[in-house]
Amino acid sequence: MSMTDNVADMLTRIRNAYKSKLINVSFPSSKIKTSILDVLQKEGYIKDYVTTQKNNISYTEVALKYSVNGDASICEIHRVSKPGKRVYSAIKDLKGYYNNMGIYILSTPYGVMSDREAHIKNVGGEVICKVF
């Protein structure tokens, strides 16, 4: 069975893993997923991730991050732009998510980046997801 939205599947697996208090979560790998994980790692929402090969299929395993008292580092993670309804935004239209405590992840002509990095580079693009 083929999936229509691989990114939404990845975000759902991460969200469910945090709710279940898991240490790691794995899913099939792709370039866009790796780019999103780079942003999440750079912003401090996940510890690390590793891509491995099993039977000619590449999988990504993500090490989830928790605080000292066991709280998840991601409270909310939602898909914004979907295959049936793409959402694009100019950088001036992106306001801070949760009073700048959360981030939007954008796909821009310069690659996948957070809204903070997009503000610095003054570039807009497709809003992939929002994280808090």
Swiss-Prot record:
It comes from the Bacteria. GO terms for biological process: translation. PROSITE patterns: RIBOSOMAL_S8. GO terms for molecular function: rRNA binding; structural constituent of ribosome. Coiled coil: none annotated. Keywords: Ribonucleoprotein, Ribosomal protein, RNA-binding, rRNA-binding. GO terms for cellular component: ribonucleoprotein complex; ribosome. SUPFAM superfamilies: Ribosomal protein S8. InterPro entries: Ribosomal_uS8, Ribosomal_uS8_CS, Ribosomal_uS8_sf. Belongs to the universal ribosomal protein uS8 family. One of the primary rRNA binding proteins, it binds directly to 16S rRNA central domain where it helps coordinate assembly of the platform of the 30S subunit. Part of the 30S ribosomal subunit. Contacts proteins S5 and S12. NCBIfam families: PRK00136.1. This is Small ribosomal subunit protein uS8. It comes from Rickettsia felis (strain ATCC VR-1525 / URRWXCal2) (Rickettsia azadi).
